[in-house]
Amino acid sequence: MIVHKQLRLSLAYCLCQPLLDLHIGGSPRSTLRTRPATSILSRLKGKHFASGAKKGDKKGICKVCGSERTNRFASTLLALPDQGKVGRALTTDTFANGSTWQYDGLNIRFRDWPFIHRARLNCLPVNNVKSRWSNSCPKCRHCNSDETLPHVLCHCLRNMPSILRRHNTIVDRIVNAVQSGTITTDQQVRAANSRLRPDIIVEEYNKVLIIDVCCPFDNNAEALRDAEQRKLNKYEGVKQFFVGQGKQCEVFGFVIGALGSWHPTNENVLRQLGMSKRYRSLFRKLCCTDAIQGSTNIYREHLGMTEGSVDADNSE
């Protein structure tokens, strides 16, 4: 019985591995090495029985096999230079906020499902991707830049109104979570003689919080860290102005990836706002799915899709 299950796992691996190894514009590995069921069992036997499971414990053995298979697939995906970059950004989130919607569908629409899974693997038919296996022009259909997915979701000038709406949705969610203090949104600090407009300023007594939201593309975890650092550097002058007035001032970059990655240092903002543990859990998930919804809208509008359209593969 166990051998038959292992054979099925090996078959599943053979079927799924080409999808994981496939780079857009390339081809799967010409040869796939599969391990016989007996070799898999021998490799897992020590792990399984070392954990205290008894011989003949089918449920325990299957659990170990499933975990081993999942880890192998995940390692293969994360090792891919292009299709694994979003996955590497998602792994920094210990709460898995960017993926829990797959189980409960929280704040996710039907149209978001086909978009987000292909977007995270860079399999959407934007011109730069299509040009890898065809003679199509890689240029953006609305400007002269290469039409990559990061360009569509974060940089194309034609999409800026939709990009701003995605940004403002997250700003509004943070504002609604503020429990006390005077809130200022998108306003210059005139006394500081600065033209900068922080997304959110919360003042309470002699304490000032400056929160600025951004949604960079999930190009590895470093992209999220760099985006946060740019926010800290940008508002350092405004921070020093409030410090000079004898106030305690903190600057926070609130970073949500365009494809739903949660930056770990966002936890500092949640603590400063005094959120309960239960609401924090919900808030994280809502912010990630807000970003996914906004990116879906941006992509569909970029391709000129109407409300009745279901799939983007046939859009030009």
Which ranges hold each PLM region?
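Extended C-terminal regions of large enzymes
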Residues: M1-N128, N135, A291
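Active-site metal-binding core of divalent-cation-utilizing nuclease and nuclease-like domains
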Residues: V129-S134, R173-C214, K234
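Short Cys/His-based metal-binding microdomains
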Residues: M1, R132-R173
